[in-house]
Amino acid sequence: AIINMSSVVGLMGNIGQANYAASKAGLIGFTKSVAREVANRNIRVNAIAPGMIESDMTAVLSDKVKDAMLAQIPMKEFGQAEQVADLTVFLAGQDYLTGQVVAIDGGLSM
């Protein structure tokens, strides 16, 4: 299985992140195209689109910025790296799932 790491920004876009959104959206198109190309060889290709995940990058954000981000997430919490890892393991083990983008974002992109 091939699992690409995209972002909800590739699904939704974001102010001031046109370059990042374009690259992540491109990765989604790439995932779907490659999935079609290699499906007949029993190779599955999917993408994960994380939302706000607690990390060193988010740790430096001010409380004001974090609160503004949390206000946009229906589940009102940031994701954890372990949750993304669990999803990765799940996708790696699925024999009948290909060409999909799975958002793990607390409902942000719905």
Task: Give the positions of each predicted feature.
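Hydrophobic structural elements of the Rossmann-like NAD(P)H-binding subdomain
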Residues: 3, 45-48, 58, 99, ...
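C-terminal substrate-recognition "lid" of short-chain dehydrogenase/reductases
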Residues: 78-104, 109
